[in-house]
Amino acid sequence: MTSIINNTNSTVFDSTNNGNMAILEPVQPVSKGPKGITFSGQTFVVPETHDMVKTLFDPTVRKSNFELIILGCLFSNLLVFLIPNNQIRIYIFIALYIFWRLSYNFGIGWLLQNQSNHNLLVSWSQKYKLFEPGNTSFLAKSIQNEIKSQRGENYDIKSMPVEFNTWLIFRKFVDLILMSDFITFCCVVYCSAIKNNYQFFNNQSSWLVYSRIVFGTGLILFNLWVKVNAHNTIKDYAWYWGDFFFRQINNEELIFDGVFEMVPHPMYSVGYVGYYGFALIAKSYVVLAIAIFGHFLQMIFLHYIENPHIDKIYGPSKNEINLIKILKLKDLKNFDNLKPLVGLTNFNWMRASDIVNLVLSLTYGIIIPLFANSIKSLFILTVGMKLFESISINLLLTLQSYFKVVTKWSLSNDIPVEKSLSNWAVLYNSLINLTYSSLFGMNLGYFLQKSSSSSSSSSSSGLLFSDWFYLRIFLGLLLVYTQFWINFSIIDSIGYFGWFYGDFFIPKSQSSIKNITTAGVYRYLNNPEQIFGVCGVMGIFMIYPTVENFICVGLWVVNNFIRINFIEKSHMVKLYGEQEVNRDSGVTKTVKKHLLPEVIQRRMSNDEAYARTNGISNGRRKSSNNSHSNSVADSLDNFIRDLRNSSTKLSQQKLIELSQNLSFANSDYKLTIDGLMQSTEGELKYTTIGTPVTISWTSPEKNHSVRDWVGLYKIVQTSYSRNKTILSSAGRWTWCKEANGTFIFDREKLFWEEGVYEFRYHLDGKHEVAYISEPFEIKSVELDVPAIEEYANEFAENLKLEIFDKVINLTNINEAISPIANQSDNVIEVYKLISSMISKSTKINITYKIFLNHDLLSIKDVAIKLINIKHVLEELSFNITTDKKDI
């Protein structure tokens, strides 16, 4: 389920109307209630709906035909209890649960994915005319009767959009599957709990039984609160995936309020802790296994169905994505333009430090434990490595924060500050790897020694506790996974710059980082690594609860606490200020808002205001990339998008037929293209990428409309229809206000890629075609790269004339490219376009990163780079040839 928040204003554009604002007519009289708008631009008032529990189980709410069927299906589960054998009942309910769970995650998932990408459900409704009053088919009558029974006899089906009516029917399938899924799970819980003469409260001490029941009930109640709070926040619209069918006006951004401010995707994460509470109460590994199974499938559903749709509808704009890309690319500039090694992630065989890290990790994690004589020696090694890492890293960070010792040393030795951060990253990661490798090696040694023992009783010797082995394994692995997930979430939020304490080493004026982040995992927690950053060590202790592991947990926790609260925090306050550092996290806000009495909330607010006035600070974690706001992504017609992405090739015969314009031989309308070149007779005329194209049109005076227009299209996308254009021109068009005239298509009006194109003359603001021009080709210009730098100026002038002048306005070949290119709304695309044009024109491949790595790069510098690249490539080619001759 997606989450939404109110926004102020929204403007809807018709993607098939050349960027002009569509006039949206409401389909019913204006009344109170939220306003909806379909993806085709039809507006309506969204009627009130109820949640599934109220709809199905509240006797005061009218039951529809489908709802009565759903209730019958739910109560039919009781028939299984007529079977006397409880184990058979468990098998049946597990099979039913698996069926409904797969129906949820793969059935509903498939429908939603196709609805999001292809408008499938709405297309079905339109294809079979399910909501047409005159349709007398059994399916249509059943569907219409269902809606009438839901909404009442006075509900006018025809007055509401097909999208909304389809959503009403889709909701009933959701009700059936979700309620059946939950009911069958509860049946599994009950049958498992009463197994073996009510085993859930037998064979355990009373305090442990009560603890399980109390803690399990707490998880279930917390789960219930999460669901209720989430529904109160996002309402039925998002609960039933309404934004897959239509949008609510002024509800166009993701919400981060209530439970959505506590954890990411609460409906899929903490929204399933109640399942584990049921497993705890039932004291059943069977229940735990199916709870894990269901939760795992739900995370798959989130990743492959929910998140892609959220990104499409609520994701960042192109400019915001562009900014994020720039920041991430500039983040790598501090690490030699390669992703640095984090643990053993981003491993590169061509990087010496990575090889050393791998060798050390294997040595301390595997080789030493294989030859160690005792656990004690491995324990001493692990403690020694952790103490060495803690003291050295904490000392260096403190000295760098207060005295800039690393920066001063680097500058005194003519080493750039960026290089000092890269060197620090290698040192920091190497020491962290050594500590975790030693910890892993200690536990591997323990396992090897215990497994080699012949006495079965010795297998649990040395453990602080040995019960609940499988539960310990599950919880331990879960904690280890959580630490990995938190670490990668931190890197995703603050980048490698933040992960390696970049603001300790790089001056703020030279960094793209200006503010502390409030995005990603930092939206919910100020210091996620303070607890979760070491929970993997706690997980290892749960799997092997030895005294040695317990001491290691203490070392990791104490070091983490000192580093964050006494080193990082003070540096952040000094760098970013107390007010910036002192903000409440999402969890803190939610606890204050929902779990603390109002009197205490007011008292805390007053205390915080007083603290800010008097300079009292709590502090928070390191810096990161600027947080970005999510904006509404434009909804595109998927059929048109398929055409746009078409890679169909036209045959030469087809091109000849198109060039003859047989369909418009006797037309009073004409389109001609001026300035095209032709290499040989019979070949298509062509122009070069970025060159302005001038067209002239002629139309009859008496039939001419000021809303006539001309658009530019790829032939491979429009050859399907010669009389009507079914594809948007994407802004590449112009009005024909006069009966005869000319227009120059340039810059954003052009296609910037090779291919065959045509112009189309359309009538009266519509898409009926009156004339199609002859096809023409857009090619890359051919530029020869000189062999020596003496001709760099001449070559640079050619680059400026044939490539750069078509994209950006530079006065001369020595002017820096970056300041001018950065004025563009999408600088990454500008750099990619220039690099692509250069690569195709010179036959020397370069990437857009050369423009990012050198802020003062000029056209002449680019020319020199190309000359040098050509020189190196020719030398390598010559050497290869020479070697072959010598052989």
From Swiss-Prot:
GO cellular component terms, alphabetically, are: endoplasmic reticulum membrane
The pathway noted for it is:
Phospholipid metabolism; phosphatidylcholine biosynthesis
| Topological region Cytoplasmic | 85-91, 195-205, 283-284, 376-377, 445-472, 552-887
Q: Can you say where in the cell this protein is located?
A: Endoplasmic reticulum membrane
Per the record's keyword annotation, is ATP-binding included, yes or no?
no
Question: What are the alphabetically sorted keywords of the record?
Answer: Endoplasmic reticulum, Lipid biosynthesis, Lipid metabolism, Membrane, Methyltransferase, Phospholipid biosynthesis, Phospholipid metabolism, S-adenosyl-L-methionine, Transferase, Transmembrane, Transmembrane helix
Pfam families per UniProt: PEMT
Chain ranges on the Lumenal side, renumbered to this chain: 1-63, 113-173, 227-261, 306-354, 399-423, 494-530
Q: Is Transport among this UniProt entry's keywords?
A: no
What InterPro entries has UniProt attached to this entry?
Phopholipid_MeTrfase, Phosphatid-EA_MeTrfase_fun
Q: What is catalyzed by this enzyme?
A: a 1,2-diacyl-sn-glycero-3-phosphoethanolamine + S-adenosyl-L-methionine = a 1,2-diacyl-sn-glycero-3-phospho-N-methylethanolamine + S-adenosyl-L-homocysteine + H(+)
Segments carrying the region annotation (Disordered) are 610-631
**What are its E.C. numbers?**
2.1.1.17
> Can you tell me which family this protein belongs to?
Belongs to the class VI-like SAM-binding methyltransferase superfamily. CHO2 family.
Q: Which HAMAP family match?
A: PEMT
Q: What does this protein do?
A: Catalyzes the first step of the methylation pathway of phosphatidylcholine biosynthesis, the SAM-dependent methylation of phosphatidylethanolamine (PE) to phosphatidylmonomethylethanolamine (PMME).
Protein name as it appears in the record: Phosphatidylethanolamine N-methyltransferase
What organism does this protein naturally occur in?
A: Candida dubliniensis (strain CD36 / ATCC MYA-646 / CBS 7987 / NCPF 3949 / NRRL Y-17841)
Q: What is the lineage of its organism?
A: Eukaryota, Fungi, Dikarya, Ascomycota, Saccharomycotina
